[in-house]
């Protein structure tokens, strides 16, 4: 069911004879991003097309960009089966950020393997930069984006600016998965200069890594 959005996006682009060069989605646990890229990734794996996939995660919970590829519990209670994934450790406690859906300690096993195999990229972005992009998007498009989606918008804007600087023309597809009308307090904090960016130290990460079980396979 998660790939429905990807199938719909592909069908809409096919209708107008378009193929995306870059496909961007926010990444917390992976369902959002995985659903969007699944149909396109299939084409890439079959050698039918060459897409560039970018996963965007919060800098305060950087499972892809700073996590370890290891077997770990999927839950903090260590009850569920373990899975091999990029993880910060089941005991990792992320800082409170407005994108609550992106605060999971691990990442989808499927996406983790794709990233590990070099089939997709990942980047981590700070909260204030995400809100800056969200406000720009709202003023231009008239849509106030959801907290998670703002991360994809940040990367999409950055890629568009890069195209403008290099003179390249690229089709960029990103996932906008909801609106942020229940998060107006966060926008108020951002505009009042009260937004805080959480920067993880290596020591913070090591505390989380200590909870990863030692599995020799």
Regions found by a protein language model. Give the residues of each.
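A glycine-rich, Thr/Ser-enriched phosphate-binding loop motif common to dinucleotide/cofactor-binding enzymes
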Residues: 1-8, 146-151
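Active-site/ligand-binding loops adjacent to catalytic centers
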Residues: 3-5, 16-17, 42-50, 55-143, ...
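Phosphate/ATP-binding catalytic cores across multiple sugar-kinase/actin-like superfamilies
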Residues: 4-19, 158-162
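A short, small-residue-rich loop immediately preceding and capping a beta-strand
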Residues: 19-33, 53, 170-176
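Active-site nucleophile and cofactor-binding loops and adjacent substrate-binding regions
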Residues: 24-29, 57, 124-126, 143-151, ...
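Short glycine/serine/threonine-rich phosphate/pyrophosphate-binding segments
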Residues: 27-37, 63-65, 149-157, 181-184
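Short glycine/serine- and small hydrophobic-enriched flexible loop segments
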Residues: 38-41, 136, 154-161
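C-terminal non-catalytic interaction/assembly regions of soluble proteins
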Residues: 148-149, 154-157, 163-171, 179-181, ...
């Amino acid at each position: 069911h998660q790939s429905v959005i990807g199938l719909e996006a592909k069908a809409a682009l096919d209708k107008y004879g378009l193929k995306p060069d870059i496909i961007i989605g926010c990444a917390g646990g992976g369902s959002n991003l995985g659903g969007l890229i699944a149909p396109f990734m299939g084409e890439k794996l079959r050698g039918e097309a060459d897409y560039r996939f970018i996963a965007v995660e919060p800098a305060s919970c950087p499972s892809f960009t700073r996590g370890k590829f290891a077997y770990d519990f999927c839950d903090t209670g260590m009850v569920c089966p373990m899975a091999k994934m990029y993880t910060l450790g089941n005991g990792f406690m992320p800082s409170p950020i407005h994108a609550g859906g992106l605060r999971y300690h691990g990442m989808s096993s499927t996406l983790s393997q794709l990233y590990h195999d070099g089939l997709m990229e990942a980047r981590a972005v700070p909260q204030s930069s995400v809100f800056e992009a969200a406000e720009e998007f709202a003023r231009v498009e008239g849509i106030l984006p959801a907290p998670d989606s703002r991360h994809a918008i940040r990367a999409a804007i950055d890629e568009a600016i890069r195209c403008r600087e290099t003179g390249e023309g690229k089709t960029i597809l990103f996932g906008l998965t909801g609106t942020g009308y229940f998060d107006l307090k966060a926008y108020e904090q951002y505009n009042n200069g009260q937004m805080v960016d959480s920067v993880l130290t290596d020591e913070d990460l090591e505390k989380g890594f200590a909870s990863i079980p030692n599995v020799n396979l």
